Amino acid sequence: MDRKEQKSIIEGLLFVSGDEGIYPEQIAKVLEIEMNEAINILEEMQQECEGANRGLQIVQYAKVYRFATKKEHASYYQKLIDTPTAASLSQAALETLAIVAYRQPITRTEMEEIRGVKTDKALQTLVSHLLIKEMGRAEGPGRPILYGTTKEFLDTFGLKTLDDLPPLSEENEQMNEADLFFGSLQEISK
């Protein structure tokens, strides 16, 4: 196996080891090479990352090597973190989120009555994005799950409290709440 292939494999090992990183001994064992050789390759790769226009660097802490982003790009990473996750939500998920935000705590059945369609997939998406969570159980047959918004919901849409949601007039309450909330979210995230 040539040096380029070894570096390619080590790059993959660094990636899959994630934040935990990887010891040179582990690399040596996987590649069936001496530990000193693994260290030499890692040091070469560190220099290559430093000299090139690359977004990643290889760092060593307590004998463990791992990938890390470069400090000079930190402002760009922060912009990504600050980008609302709503951009990745479907229209159905946004509509369901609007209903939960204005009517919480609310059951899945109540959401489906308002939307007129099933909400299983949308609920699953919203829970996985940590925008809603189970708030308890409703009284009544089957004790259905009650859903409500989370702190992450407030953070994502730049709200301090639910009171910061645009108010719904009586006339607007008869309209599709999801469309109103979707419009409000677009205003908030600008």
Swiss-Prot record:
It comes from the Bacteria. Its main location: cytoplasm. It is found in: Cytoplasm. Keywords: Cell cycle, Cell division, Chromosome partition, Cytoplasm. SUPFAM superfamilies: Winged helix' DNA-binding domain (SSF46785). It comes from Bacillus cereus (strain B4264). This is Segregation and condensation protein B. Belongs to the ScpB family. InterPro entries: ScpB_csome_segregation, WH-like_DNA-bd_sf, WH_DNA-bd_sf. Coiled coil: none annotated. NCBIfam families: SMC-Scp complex subunit ScpB. Homodimer. Homodimerization may be required to stabilize the binding of ScpA to the Smc head domains. Component of a cohesin-like complex composed of ScpA, ScpB and the Smc homodimer, in which ScpA and ScpB bind to the head domain of Smc. The presence of the three proteins is required for the association of the complex with DNA. GO terms for biological process: cell division; chromosome separation; DNA replication. GO terms for cellular component: cytoplasm. The gene is scpB. Participates in chromosomal partition during cell division. May act via the formation of a condensin-like complex containing Smc and ScpA that pull DNA away from mid-cell into both cell halves.
